[in-house]
A protein has these predicted regions:
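Bacterial Sec-dependent N-terminal signal peptides
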Residues: 1-27
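Charge-dense, helix-prone N-terminal extensions
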Residues: 25, 50-51
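Alpha-helical adaptor scaffolds
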Residues: 219-331
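Extended, well-structured beta-strand/loop surface patches
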Residues: 52-113, 119-221
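TPR/TPR-like (Sel1-like) alpha-helical repeat modules
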Residues: 267, 283-286, 333-349
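Short N-terminal segments immediately surrounding and downstream of signal-peptide cleavage
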Residues: 26-45
Length: 349
């Protein structure tokens, strides 16, 4: 009796489906902590950094890690995979990967945003950090130097006082535009300096955010314009943003902060008459504290006489209320009249 073709195909399909279902549901058992799957992340400005690695342990091999089969020097043939000379995998099991959400520089050399396989060629007194396009490999067994994107040198710090049992990546010495990724294992530390162009990356983020619904939000536009003024960048576009904010038919925000931002941008664009007119309008809207802050700003800009006018106006308008006497003291001091400064200093107490 012949089996009909449709029934035969149905049997094959069901068998294939069952095999795949069983494979997908195979039991998973922890590896007993031999190599701990680990992740570490940090944000620098608007740049996200993430490292994924498996963390081997020293396991009694102290003094026999570096320059041995555990973490060999240079490039060695591992005997499996591509059978090519390969660097250390900077971890265990799968390839270590590192991701950057924006362009960065590594020890001063540029690296584009993306995710990379991370390897290290170890030497006695230096290390070559290797960023590679292959992020799916098993360790460095299938390392292909043709996929390398960046090589950069760093110097390891040997003889750290405390031994680190598990290979660890963590973040140290962070500033507003940089951070050092530290690989610590046994008594070695391998530092990797990461820097970002804070202004460039932040501006790109601002533009991206304002391209959506946030671009219709006056407070967001005001914040973006003020940031550009403070960071001396993107004046023309920032002025277009603040114009929307202060327009009586659009944003309708006529506060001291918004108007002074507009005045500052006009001044940066070499439009002093327009700037002065807007700044006068801003001062008419200002609170005592806002005027005081503006006067201090003028002193910091090396304009003590202009600052004195602001402090005097503030003192008279607000009838000596705090902090106007403090402003008068600062103004007289900046203009070299210490006697009058002392007089108003006593009034401020």
């Amino acid at each position: 009796m012949k089996t009909s073709t449709p029934k035969y195909l149905l049997f094959i399909f069901c068998l294939f489906f069952t095999i795949n279902l069983v494979s997908a549901q195979m039991i998973r058992i922890p590896d007993g902590g031999v190599n701990l799957k680990s992740v570490a992340g940090r944000r620098v400005g608007v740049t996200d950094i993430e490292i994924n690695w498996n963390a081997p342990g020293v396991k009694g091999r102290e003094g026999n890690i570096w320059g041995t089969s555990v973490a060999p020097y240079g490039f060695t043939v591992l005997g499996y995979g591509s059978y090519m000379e390969s660097p250390w995998r900077a971890g265990s099991n799968e390839s270590t990967t590192i991701s950057f959400s924006t362009d960065v520089s590594i020890n001063g050399k540029p690296l584009a945003a993306g995710t990379y396989g991370f390897f290290i060629a170890l030497y006695a007194d230096s290390c070559t950090l290797i960023f590679n396009k292959n992020t799916k490999g098993w360790g460095s067994y299938f390392y292909n130097k043709e996929l390398d994107v960046l090589h950069v040198t760093t110097r390891q710090r040997k003889n750290q006082p405390e031994s680190v049992e598990r290979l660890t990546y963590h973040f140290i010495d962070q500033t507003d535009h940089s951070v050092t990724v530290a690989l610590d294992w046994e008594h070695w530390r391998i530092p990797i300096n990461v820097e970002v162009d804070l202004v460039k990356t932040t501006l790109a983020s601002i533009r991206q955010q304002l391209s959506g619904a946030m671009g219709f939000d006056p407070p967001s536009l005001e914040t973006a314009a003020a940031w550009c003024l403070q960071n001396n960048t993107n004046y023309d576009q920032a002025l277009s943003w603040i114009n929307v904010v202060t327009d009586p038919n659009l944003g309708r925000i006529q506060t001291f902060t918004a108007l002074s931002t507009k005045a500052g941008l006009l001044n940066k664009l070499d439009r002093p008459e327009e700037s002065a007119k807007i700044m006068q309008h801003a001062m008419d809207k200002a609170t005592a504290l806002e005027m005081h802050g503006y006067g201090r700003q003028l002193i910091n800009q090396g304009k003590p006489k202009e600052a004195m006018v602001v402090f005097e106006t503030n003192y008279k308008r607000n009838k000596g209320a705090w902090p106007t006497a403090v402003g008068m003291m600062r103004g007289y001091s900046a203009n070299g009249d210490l006697k009058k400064a002392l007089e108003f200093g006593k009034k401020a107490l």
